[in-house]
Every structure is written in C-alpha cells, then in structure tokens.
Design a protein with these regions (language model features):
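Conserved short alpha-helical segments that host acidic/polar catalytic motifs at enzyme active sites
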Residues: 1-483
Length: 483
C-alpha cells in the first residue's frame, strides 16, 4: 500500500493552507438563536477560504459553541444549570461492529468519574444539503449529555471531565479495533460539531443548530483543513479549545519538548492517528489549562508569545513575565492566527510573525474577530470600533468581567497576577555564585592528561578554513552572530 503522505517528490509536510477562522460573541452573555444565524452568515461569506474537490466535497469545517441551556433542557426533559452538566460528542469507530464497544467505553469512563448519563443520542443531520459525493465522507456523531457529580463544579469538574477524556483516548488511540473513535469535544461549557464540509454547509447540515430553541452567546468557526494532513473529519477544526489558521513551523520542536516534559512527569502523551500541527497545539493547550492549572489567556500567551526581547515599549513586569514563560515553554511559531475559547473567555491571537489576517469589529451588542472584514452585516447597530490584530497581538472578551481586553491591557493584567520578576530571579543561576570545583577531582583516571596544540583543537572541534572565513572571523570583526 502506498503511503499517500509521502510519495515521489510529494511530501505532505510541505502542504500549506489559507484557512478562514473567526469568532462572534454577545457581550451581555444572553443566549439567542440569532447568533447562530449570524455565524452562518459569516461562514457563507468565506467559501474561497475553504478547499473543495471537483465533486464538491469540502475538506473540513466546523463550529464550537457554548452549551444551549434551553435546547438541552428539552433534549433531556429536565431543568439543567450551566456548569452542572456536560456534553460529549464522538465520532464512532470505522467498524460498525465496534460501535457498542465504543459506547460502553464512553459510558464506563463517565461512570468511573461519577458522571450521570442523562441522554445518549445520535446528532441528527440533513444530508440533502450536501453534494452526493460528500455524503459518504461524513462520519456520524454520537452525543452524551451527562450530569456532574454532586458537589463537583468549576475547575474540579473540568478536571474530572479531562480524566474521563484521557481514559477514553488511552484506549481509542491504541486499540486497532476502535480505529476511528475520536472525541470531538467533552466539556461542561462548549461543544464542537464538524465534518468534511464546506463553510456554508455547517449550520444547515447539523439539524440541532436549526432548532429555534438552540440559543447560544458565543460561536467560533474554522473552514479549510488542518495543515499537513489528508482530509478527514477528525482533523477538521475547531478542536476542543481553539481553531488555528496557518502552519506551525516549530511543530517538530514543540512535540519533542512536550514529550520530554511528559517523560519528566512519568507520563506519556497519547496522540490520535494522523495528528496535525493544529491538533497537537490544542492538545498542549488543554494540558496547560487542565493539568498545569493555567488560565486560558496565560496559557495562550506563554505558548505563543510576542517578540518581546528587543521591544522597549513593554513594561518591566510584562518583560519579566515573558522571560519567565521562556524558561519552560517552547514557542509555537507560525504563521498562526489563533481563535481560543472556553465558554467564559473567547479571543483571538496572532503569532509574532503576523502573517495571517484577523479583522475585528465591536458593536454595542457584539464583538467579532474574523479572517476578513464585513463577514457579518450588523445593520443599523452602532459600531464602537473596527481594527485588526497586529503581529504578537490579541483581543479577547471575558464574560465574567463583561469587558474586552486588547494586547496591552491583556499583558499588563496577566503580569500583575504574579511576581514574575522574583520568579525569574529565583530560577536564575549565576555562574559567579557557584562554588569552585577542581576539574581533576571529577576527571576519570583514563582521561587525556596532555594538551592539544592549537591546530589540534581546531580538528577536535571540526573547525576548518571555511568555518573561520565565513563564520568565526566575521563574528569576531562585527560582534554579531552570523546567520
């Protein structure tokens, strides 16, 4: 069988894409069905940012939305409270004979953490909105609606759901019979719906989103496919906490770093089959928020920092914070435009290269950031501001504080939360402060006791005339590092 990811002169690692991403949120936090319709309008405005086969099959699109209280009250025939229930959406295994096993796995994992399953259902779809060739490319989505254990709320509930998710993934990603079992999302705040779709097909395809009682206050979307992967519903976006436009050119380095961190903690990272760079970024973000207990904005900034080293406009506390982040976090460099959200915070960030477009508009009712301006017609509603996110910049809305934060405000707010200057000082090791140690004391008896000539040292360190002519001599002459 031919490996389609690398054949002849073709290598999928060099694939590029120009995705469409964005978010829309009601600043008052009120859930309405109209926000879904505005999201559909935004998605219909960017078909050129999605990929489509000659037969009209989209290469991937989806939405992440907050959980609709009104809708899930009807689905469960009960009165639910936000933060006291959750929703899990799953692609089932490719082999229909394994569906019951997969359902039992999910049910068992929920029960282990004390979750109470309220409803298990298949997400209804309208195949008539798709081209005939696209129907066979879609995967059915099974949905679990579950109640939180008594007394478990907030961050503790998020951790319990995360443990449930990890238990499911540990078997789903390592058992050949369960190939295809993939959790789109499992959360007490958000749910993800996606597939091999074109942007204009998302809302009409998922019938839940067309129900008038399906009311939400936040939506973020992605159209086109994850970089460096063959089109498949599981690697379509959004992922669980973010959507990413671009490609992460530091992905290999970031994976090595994550593996090293996991090994130091005596853990093991279990990755889904064919994981894209965007999916890996989302997996890391989940780890930072749930396992390392960082708030979402801090995690995003630490993973994708601005170019701060030579920026004299940043305050000392902000510089100390970013320096501290650099001690433990490998930077994720793109080009990358990132949309992130967890139900209470929704935001957008551009990496320090700044090579992906993000346009913003704020009205009295809404805040939106999208790949292109004018994707939504807000009618006669007064516009408070329009703009764009610059390299290393961000804009997010905090529904708990009922306000938005730009780049400067966000960095200053984060820097004020801890004494990063002291943390950097505590982490720094000064060579002058180290006690003197005799080299002879630690030299093995078999070590070379003589001395190399100067030319011998050149050979030992693989230095030749080319190294001196093009690297060392210019560095000595200019005092700058040769690129």
């Amino acid at each position: 069988m031919v490996d389609a990811t690398k054949f002849g002169l073709y290598d999928s690692a060099f694939e590029k894409s120009s995705c469409g991403v964005g978010f829309l949120t009601r600043k008052d936090g009120r859930q309405t069905h109209d926000l879904l319709m505005k999201g559909h309008e935004a998605l219909c405005a960017v078909p050129h940012r999605g990929g489509m086969s000659a037969e009209g099959v989209g290469d991937g699109a989806g939405v992440s939305i907050d959980l609709s209280i009104e809708f899930f009250n009807r689905v469960t025939n009960s009165v639910l409270t936000l933060g006291e229930f959750g929703v899990g959406n799953f692609f089932l295994p490719n082999d229909p004979a394994q569906h019951d096993r997969a359902r039992n796995l999910v049910a068992s994992a929920l029960k282990t953490e004390g979750m109470i399953s309220l409803v298990t259902r298949d997400v209804e779809v309208d195949q008539s909105v798709l081209r005939p060739a696209a129907i066979k490319c879609q995967l059915p989505i099974a949905q679990w609606v579950f109640a939180a254990p008594a007394g478990i709320r907030g961050a503790e509930l998020d951790k319990a759901i995360h443990r449930t998710l990890m238990a499911i993934e540990a078997e789903a990603y390592t058992c050949a019979e369960l190939d295809g079992l993939y959790p789109l999302s499992m959360s007490a705040n958000m749910q993800v719906l996606k597939g091999r779709l074109n942007s204009n097909e998302i809302i009409p395809y998922f019938l839940d989103l067309n129900e008038l009682d399906h009311s939400i206050h936040t939506l973020y979307f992605h159209t086109r496919f994850s970089t460096n992967t063959d089109p498949h519903p599981s690697m379509a976006q959004p992922f669980r906490m973010m959507a990413h436009n671009g490609e992460l050119n530091t992905d290999k380095k970031n994976r090595l770093s994550e593996t090293a961190i996991a090994r130091s903690r005596e853990n093991k990272i279990i990755r889904p089959k064919g994981q894209s760079d965007s999916c890996r970024l989302d997996q890391t973000l989940q780890s930072r928020v749930i396992e390392d207990e960082l708030d979402l904005v801090t995690a995003v900034v630490s993973m994708m920092p601005p170019a701060w080293e030579n920026d004299d406009t940043l305050s000392s506390p902000v510089r100390a914070m970013l320096e501290y982040f650099s001690l433990y976090e490998e930077k994720n460099d793109g080009p990358a435009a990132l949309i992130f959200g967890n139900g209470s915070i929704i935001g957008a960030r551009l990496d320090r290269l700044g090579l992906r477009p993000l346009r913003s508009i704020e009205t009295e009712t809404y805040l939106a950031v999208m790949s292109e301006a004018g994707q939504i017609d807000f009618g006669d509603e007064p516009v408070l501001s329009r703009g764009r996110i610059e390299a290393g910049g961000m804009l997010y809305y905090d529904h708990e504080q009922k306000r938005s934060f730009g780049t400067h405000e966000a960095l200053e707010s984060l820097a004020s939360q801890r004494d990063y200057s002291q943390l950097v000082k505590n982490a720094r090791i000064e060579i002058d402060d180290l006690p003197e140690v005799s080299a002879a004391e630690y030299s093995p008896s078999s070590s070379y006791s003589g001395d190399l000539s100067l030319s011998g040292r050149y050979v030992a360190y693989s230095q030749n005339q080319e190294c001196f002519r093009f690297m060392i001599d210019p560095m000595l002459a200019t005092g700058t590092e040769k690129v």
